[in-house]
Every structure is written in structure tokens, then in C-alpha cells.
From Swiss-Prot:
Domain of life: Bacteria
Cited SUPFAM superfamilies: Ribosomal protein S5 domain 2-like
Enzyme class: lyase
UniProt-listed GO biological process terms: L-histidine biosynthetic process
Family: Belongs to the imidazoleglycerol-phosphate dehydratase family.
Keywords: Amino-acid biosynthesis, Cytoplasm, Histidine biosynthesis, Lyase
Localization of this protein: Cytoplasm
Lineage: Bacteria, Pseudomonadati, Pseudomonadota, Gammaproteobacteria, Pseudomonadales
Source organism of the structure: Pseudomonas fluorescens (strain SBW25)
Primary site of residence: cytoplasm
Presence of keyword Transmembrane: no
Enzyme Commission number(s): 4.2.1.19
Identification of the protein by name: Imidazoleglycerol-phosphate dehydratase
Length: 197
């Protein structure tokens, strides 16, 4: 089996980002982004998706976190698209429900080749530790646009904003793990009746 790894660099006037992933990893993660809460959430993707992630970013954090958070999503999406290749043999679809105390979230993903995001998270606070939680919409939109996936994110309940977000990212990691997993019964076949994704 060919290694499903990729490294991508993004260099703009706002951010310089290097991202490396291994879809068949063990959940190892290393981050140097400068946005601790984002790094904490990315660690959930790695751990629960069993995807090795290494992301280094230098951005205009003196302005705010927006460009860095969005561009990390873009770069991660590009890395996924590159690592997954032609998509032959993958399960394609993934879903997960994850609870954390009072919070419960559901994430469903389709590596369809058609970008689309439906995200419904009724945050109970605007910030967590100074981090603007609205920026996660930008992160996921960037990921979706460049990984070329359809992604549905729903926080079904929760009163603690940190818990709401953490359940989303844990469910996202688990849904990714399911979707990118190779299915022995689909070996070498495209998971679509069209023959292409």
C-alpha cells in the first residue's frame, strides 16, 4: 500500500504555514501556531482520527487570530486532498457522535469532491480564553473548500462553550478516521457509481 502522507506549504502576506499529515498514523501531533486553543482542538483531530499532524505557522497574530485560523484550515484541507489521492478504496463517508458531560455533537463527512459546509453550533459564549469561537466557522470553511468535502456539523446540546467545541472537534476527528479508512472489499475501486469523485 502506498503511503498516504502529504506536506503542504502556504505562503501569503498574512501567514506562512507548513502542514504535514499521515492518514495512517497513530495520532501523533506537533503544533507551533501561536493560538493555543486552536492547537488544543487540532490535537483532538489527531488523537481521535489517528492521523499524524505537524503544523507550523507564523501569522499576523498582532492583528488577530482570523487569518491564521482560516489559513490553517485551508492548508490542512489541501494536505488531506493531496494525501488521499484518487480516493480509490476509501470508505468515503464518515460520521460520529461525541459527548462531553452535558454537550453532544454530531459530525458527518463525505469526500465527494464537492465542497459544502453546514455548521450549526449555538455557542453559549463568544470567546473561550480570549479565543473568538466564530473563527471555527472560518477554519472549517477553509478546510471544506480545499479538501473538497461535504461537511455537516451539529452541536445537539451543550451549555459549556469549551465542551461544545471540543465535542465538535473530537467528532470531526472520528468522522475523518472512518471516511479515509481503506475498505478491503473496495480495494482499488472508486466509492461512487459515477466512477469518479
Amino acid at each position: 500500500m502506498a503511503e498516504r502522507k502529504a506536506s503542504v506549504e502556504r505562503d501569503t502576506l498574512e501567514t506562512q504555514i507548513k502542514a504535514s499529515i499521515n492518514l495512517d498514523g497513530t495520532g501523533k501531533a506537533r503544533f507551533d501556531i501561536g493560538v493555543p486553543f486552536l492547537e488544543h482542538m487540532l490535537d483532538q483531530i489527531a488523537r481521535h482520527g489517528l492521523i499524524d499532524l505537524d503544523i507550523v505557522s507564523k501569522g499576523d497574530l498582532h492583528i488577530d487570530d482570523h487569518h491564521t485560523v482560516e489559513d490553517v484550515g485551508i492548508t490542512l484541507g489541501q494536505a488531506f486532498a493531496k494525501a488521499i489521492g484518487d480516493k480509490k478504496g476509501i470508505r468515503r463517508y464518515g460520521h460520529a457522535y461525541v459527548p462531553l458531560d452535558e454537550a453532544l455533537s454530531r459530525v458527518v463527512i463525505d469526500f465527494s469532491g464537492r465542497p459544502g459546509l453546514q455548521m450549526h453550533v449555538p455557542y453559549t459564549r463568544a470567546t473561550v480564553g480570549g479565543f473568538d469561537v466564530d473563527l471555527f466557522q472560518e477554519f472549517f470553511q477553509g478546510f471544506v473548500n480545499h479538501a473538497l468535502v461535504s461537511l455537516h456539523i451539529d452541536n445537539l446540546r451543550g451549555t459549556n462553550t469549551h465542551h461544545q467545541i471540543e465535542t465538535v472537534f473530537k467528532a470531526f476527528g472520528r468522522a475523518l478516521r472512518m471516511a479515509v479508512e481503506l475498505d478491503d472489499r473496495m480495494a482499488g475501486q472508486m466509492p461512487s457509481t459515477k466512477g469518479v469523485l
